[in-house]
Amino acid sequence: MDGSWLSSEAIEVSKTRLNRTGYFETVDVTTENVGATDDTVSVNTKVKERPTGSISGGIGIGTDSGLTIQASISQNNLFGWGTRANITSYENDYRKHMEIGYTDPYFTVDNVSLGGRLYLDKYDGDDDEDVVDYTNHTCGATFNLGYPISETWFVNYNLGIEKSKIKNNGTRFEQSDVFFNMYSKDPTRSVNFLDYKLGFDITHNSLDKGVFPTSGNKQTVSLTATTPNSDMHYYKATAETYHYFPIDLYHEYVFTVRGRIGYGNGYRSKNGVREILPFFDNFSLGGSEWMRGFSRNSIGPRALYKYPIIDAYYESSTSVGGNAFWTATAEFVIPTPLVAEAYKSSVRSAVFFDAGALWDTRSKMYTVDYSDPGKYRTSVGFALTWMSPMGPLSFNIAKAIKKYDGDDTQQFNFNIGSSF
């Protein structure tokens, strides 16, 4: 503010705030004397803008799942107001997903945020495609309201409505039989569910940058539950943490650790039996973010299919997810070779180690016991991300180290897009 005392601490806070937006590649703040006296200075801020909009696409290659295609259009600084908008789609042989979202993080002068999203998801499984054999068509809407409670703490509330249409395709499996029997529904016919969801999350963020942070930490705790007037009654809770430790003075070498845990279950009884987290809303593990080296949604408890003649189930190689998980990652960020000084702020290279487990605590309900949290997977690899003038481009090369029969491994994954 004009006429106020100069504070080096306040200058650093302002610089960090600008970096956290993710809108700028570099932020430099300098001071210079004003006029003939040396008791008045001017604070000057020089920034190099980063492209905040993107049109991107991605291709994943898996040993069993084949090609996965995704595309998105997003703008994180719409009209220069700091608002965020996106259109995202994801498609493979058995799933189609599309969503539209909009958030205004500066809805009021006190930084209260307001936003929402609409989504449509169609899952058409087929046991010949090595995915769980059922159909689930879902559409819904979510509205959120958030506000800061301090410089580094932020609270967000959300309200959602979701309609689902579910049925077995023909090959019965035990997880779906248990679910449909609980609600006295015929699994061979389409069943409709209407659920209202309430959510809450709290975030602490002391990272130095919004893109490619090199120091600080970030934690988020989230809870989502269906309301008592919904057709199903369950909750899901997650917690995640990120930590960045610079090794050298220039933050070219950075050690990073991150972790995530989750748990979900039912909270009421139906026909004398406690409800469960629906099998189609289970947690999943595998993919380019948390468990590299394994294809998306490819590890964890398996679908237990029913023999066509006898009244018994057998274990398949198809993952159906679980109601509890943990993941942990260690990364060592290193300078990228052959990159000019002018582009170093836009490129990040790292070697990584990923580990994680996905299990089901409701072992007494099923023929096979999947309740062991110690049945984990691990992988190692190299990751490269470039915020190029043509858009974000990332590569992951990974090797699954500890794996189990039926796991769908993915040695290579890349995403490419164009920015505006």
Descriptions of predicted regions:
Residues 7, 84, 266, 326, ...:
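Short, electropositive, low-hydrophobicity segments enriched in small/polar residues
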Residues 2-5, 368:
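C-terminal soluble interaction/assembly domains
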Residues 104, 245, 334, 388-391:
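Hydrophobic alpha-helix-in-membranes signature
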Residues 4-220, 255-257, 292-293, 297-310, ...:
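Gram-negative/organellar outer-membrane beta-barrel architecture
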Residues 69, 326, 380:
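Catalytic-loop motifs flanking and including active-site residues across diverse enzymes
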Residues 282-288, 292, 362-420:
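C-terminal beta-signal and terminal closure region of outer-membrane beta-barrel proteins
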Residues 20, 54, 172-346, 351-355, ...:
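C-terminal outer-membrane beta-barrel translocator/porin domains of Gram-negative envelope proteins
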Residues 36-38, 321-325, 341-346, 351, ...:
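A structural signal for short secondary-structure junctions
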